[in-house]
Amino acid sequence: MKLTDFKVLAFDVYGTLIDWESGMVTALKPLTDKVSQNLTRDDILEAHAYHESTTQRWTPNKKYFDLLAVVYRRLAEEWGVEVTWEECQAYGLSVRQWPAFDDSREALAYLKQHYNLVVLTNTDNTSFSGSNARLDVHFDGVYTAEDVGSYKPSDRHFDYML
């Protein structure tokens, strides 16, 4: 099987095209600056992953920006920091500002010449629209967790795309 045998490429965005780890760590800085313990980047990302996956399981229909607001609140509780709901919501909306990897735009422009491009993402439509503006490509299909009503790795996500 050769790559030229395919007409459509489907992939995730966050971690593939958008540097979600750097975006998260930067957006969490107002919170982590208040923490008395010394947190490494890995500490932050591991705690975030735990709270994110738990929240996704409990509330699979929640929009990603709302889910991230809950994650922010849970991180603050874990780290013993007081935060306002407005701070939590600001973090939830930060996805739109997360940076693209340096080579993403060029790679997508090249791939678009040869393939239909499809996105399957755990984010919501609002968050993805901000990221898509950074990527500057027309995707032939965009399937968000908001559209599907579940989060990956649920089979529902992949069935919806197909």
Model-derived segments and spans:
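N-terminal helical cap/lid subdomain that shapes the substrate entry/recognition surface
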Residues: 3-102
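Structured loop/turn residues at beta-strand edges in well-structured enzyme cores
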Residues: 4, 113, 137
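Short glycine-/acidic-enriched loop or helix-start segments at secondary-structure transitions
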Residues: 20-21, 27, 129-131, 154
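Substrate-recognition element of Asp-dependent hydrolases with the DxDx(T/V) motif
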Residues: 85-99, 104-133, 143-145
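Receiver (REC) domain switch/active-site residues of two-component response regulators
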Residues: 140
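Histidine-bearing beta->alpha loop at or near hydrolase active sites
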Residues: 147-149
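Conserved Lys-Pro-Asp/Glu-containing loop-to-beta segment of HAD-superfamily phosphomonoesterases
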Residues: 151-162
